[in-house]
Amino acid sequence: MSRKPFIAGNWKMNKNPEEAKAFVEAVASKLPSSDLVEAGIAAPAVDLTAVLAAAKGSNLKVAAQNCYFENSGAFTGETSPQVLKEIGTDYVVIGHSERRDYFHETDEDINKKAKAIFANGMLPIICCGESLETYEAGKAAEFVGAQVSAALAGLTAEQVASTVIAYEPIWAIGTGKSASQDDAQKMCKVVRDVVAADFGQEVADKVRVQYGGSVKPENVASYMACPDVDGALVGGASLEAESFLALLDFVK
């Protein structure tokens, strides 16, 4: 079945609201048709209202970079999924390796967040990926498979079918090293096979699997040519409007 490609830029902790607004204004009217490709930006929490206002009426989807699994309460410094939905957020990125690494997020946390995101009417972009050590030990498939299974545990088949899963080998994030086309295809297929084993092939055929890790305008088309790669989660190359638009050129 055909899955609509999804290119999402992850700005990480970059841009103030003014810069974010200028970026969205520069790209909003130049995006390809939403029939061809979905384009999104994951903005820092402090930029979300500016991004949402600037993106209004355009094809640009807006994602938060994280949220908590409770809607409100004594959770100082956390972001409410309920409020993210209320302001108009479409997606929430969860389980990014930087969150797992620096903030000690567990598979269980990520699973709770996925459930909270669905409960509030948004969609999760669930990140998974292995370290260089795990990759070199030949255990990438086993490790990533366990991450995916744990993140999706207890979700309905319908929820899983609309989930986006981003495979990002940690050794390729921001390092300038990117996985080969073969590696990306192999691991994105591992992700899909795990979904098939847990929820059935029909669901697995609907899940969109992104590749992330040093994706640039020059190499995005080669990844998008892989049968199991349905998009990309892009860091550095999504920070400039021109570069972000160039990432979407593969649809031409």
From Swiss-Prot:
Pathway: Carbohydrate biosynthesis; gluconeogenesis; Carbohydrate degradation; glycolysis; D-glyceraldehyde 3-phosphate from glycerone phosphate: step 1/1. The active site is at 96 (electrophile), 168 (proton acceptor). CDD domains: TIM. It comes from the Bacteria. Signal peptide: none annotated. It is found in: Cytoplasm. One of its GO terms (cellular component) is cytosol. Its EC number is 5.3.1.1. Keywords: Cytoplasm, Gluconeogenesis, Glycolysis, Isomerase. One of its GO terms (biological process) is glycolytic process. Pfam families: TIM (PF00121). It catalyses: D-glyceraldehyde 3-phosphate = dihydroxyacetone phosphate. One of its GO terms (molecular function) is triose-phosphate isomerase activity. Substrate binds at residues 10-12, 174, 214, 235-236. Homodimer. PANTHER family: TRIOSEPHOSPHATE ISOMERASE (PTHR21139:SF42). Belongs to the triosephosphate isomerase family. Involved in the gluconeogenesis. Catalyzes stereospecifically the conversion of dihydroxyacetone phosphate (DHAP) to D-glyceraldehyde-3-phosphate (G3P). This is Triosephosphate isomerase.
